[in-house]
C-alpha cells in the first residue's frame, strides 16, 4: 500500500508539471505570432476565439487530423520513434527544476549534471529523424544540428561550471539559495560573461533564430523534419518550444535567483512584495527569457553556418575559460557579497 501511495503521488506531481508545461508550449506559439506581429506592425492571429486565444487549439486539431505519411524508402521504426526521442528529454529535464522552494519532483544532488545530460540528449531525436527519412535535405539539416549542439554544449557546460564554482553545489535548490537576496545578490552580476555565453549557447542549442541553420528554409527545405507531417511534425514542434522554456527556466535558476524576489531585502519594496509567491517570480523570469527568444527572431537575420561555428569555438569557449580563471580569483579573495 505504501508503494502504491508513493507511486500515486509521484504520478500526480509529474502530471501537475507536464500538463501546465504542455499548455505553456501551446500558448508560446500563440505568443510568438502575436509578439512578432506587433514588432512588424501587424496584428497576428485574432480570429479563432477572443483575440485569437483558441488559435493553438485549432492548430493542434489541424495537425492531429492530418495523415502521417512515411516515405517509401524510410526506416519506418526509427522514423516513428524519432519525434518521441526529441521531446522526452525536454520534459524529463523538468524533474529536477524547483519552480518554488521545495517544489521539485526530484531533489537530487547532481541536478546540474542531469540538466546538461538531458539538454544534450535531445539531438539524438534530430539525428535519427534526418537519417531515417532517407532524404538528402533532412540529412544535411541533421549534420548541421548535431555539429551545432556539440559546439555550443561545450561553451554552455563551461558557463554552468562557473555557477557550480560560485554556489559550491550541483543541487539546483542550493544554487538558488546561494543567491538569496535581491537582484544584486544573484549570479548574473559576478558571472555576467558566463551568463551571456550560456544564453547565446542556449539559443543555438535550441536551433532558434539567428542560429536556425538546421531548418534553413531557403537552403535545405526546412531541414531534418522535411518529411514529417501531422502528429509527428507536431511533436517536433512541441519539442522545440519545450526546449525553449527549459533553457529559459534554467537561466532563471542559475543566474536570476530562481524563486527569489528581485526586491528581497530592500527596505521599502521588499516588505511590500513579500506576499508574492516564489513560483510567480520564477514564472516571470522564465517569461522574460522566452520573450528574448521571440525578440531575437524578429530582430536578427540568420547567421551563415561558418559564422556560427566560428562564434562557438573561437569566441564563446575562450571567453568562458578566461572568466573561470577570473572567478577563481574572486572566490579565493572573497570578492563581493557572492563568495
Curated annotation (Swiss-Prot):
A biological-process GO annotation: aerobic respiration
Keywords: Cell inner membrane, Cell membrane, Membrane, NAD, Quinone, Translocase, Transmembrane, Transmembrane helix, Ubiquinone
One CC-aspect GO term: plasma membrane
Segments traversing the membrane: 7-27, 77-97, 112-132, 149-169, 180-200, 235-255, 276-296, 315-335
Pfam families: NADHdh (PF00146)
Reactions accelerated catalytically: a quinone + NADH + 5 H(+)(in) = a quinol + NAD(+) + 4 H(+)(out)
InterPro entries: NADH_UbQ_OxRdtase_su1/FPO (IPR001694), NADH_UbQ_OxRdtase_su1_CS (IPR018086)
Subcellular localization: Cell inner membrane
Predominant location category: membrane
EC assignment: 7.1.1.-
GO molecular function annotation: NADH dehydrogenase activity; oxidoreductase activity, acting on NAD(P)H, quinone or similar compound as acceptor; quinone binding
Membrane disposition: Multi-pass membrane protein
NCBIfam families: PRK06076.1-2
Similarity comment text for this entry: Belongs to the complex I subunit 1 family.
Stated role: NDH-1 shuttles electrons from NADH, via FMN and iron-sulfur (Fe-S) centers, to quinones in the respiratory chain. The immediate electron acceptor for the enzyme in this species is believed to be ubiquinone. Couples the redox reaction to proton translocation (for every two electrons transferred, four hydrogen ions are translocated across the cytoplasmic membrane), and thus conserves the redox energy in a proton gradient. This subunit may bind ubiquinone.
Oligomeric and partner information: NDH-1 is composed of 14 different subunits. Subunits NuoA, H, J, K, L, M, N constitute the membrane sector of the complex.
Protein name per the record: NADH-quinone oxidoreductase subunit H
Organism: Alkalilimnicola ehrlichii (strain ATCC BAA-1101 / DSM 17681 / MLHE-1)
